[in-house]
């Protein structure tokens, strides 16, 4: 397929709406967000939820990692240099919140909805459940994932050949988990796990084998 075989349509994060309205035939989205929205829309129309399908970019590109749904905390060099303690405190706060979500997902979701009632819908509940497995326990940037995505972007011509990933784990003050010994296998197992969550609901995590 070349760029002459399709028409790109800019729709921002409104992929679900654009597909439902027929503005686009396919779009780029997240398995734990747009897929859920489309599945529930189909169910409301009396149609099977599996009428919507997703081709995972990480699987298509054989990246061996799922890194397109990462939340990044971005700061410029000047702020980092002038406020290292603030950054440390911010990361500790994020870690504390992450630990709480992983330990008490039901309570965490209830507090989330209490703070932002508009999110208290059946669809958003399912999105939260489908997002649970993706939470990073230690919040670290994984070098392998950054390198794979960077190289993939270079092959696509998005990045030039001299680009280097710009990230750091310097402001993480706790022990980091060891890297997975089978990231490609994890990718496949995560897909199967998410199918179970989609069918049965609840909060499930993937058990990952790590290097010693």
Question: Language model features by range: what are they?
Answer:
Residues 37, 60, 130-132, 169-176:
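Short secondary-structure boundary/hinge segments and terminal tails
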Residues 151-212:
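Conserved C-terminal helix/tail region of periplasmic/extracytoplasmic solute-binding proteins
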Residues 2-7, 48-54, 116-130, 159-167:
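Short, surface-exposed acidic
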Residues 12-117:
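Pocket-lining segment of extracytoplasmic ligand-binding domains
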Residues 81-161:
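Secondary-structure end/capping motifs
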Residues 2-4, 32, 38, 108-109, ...:
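Bulky hydrophobic/aromatic packing residues
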Residues 43-57, 137-164, 202-209:
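Hydrophobic transmembrane alpha-helix bundles
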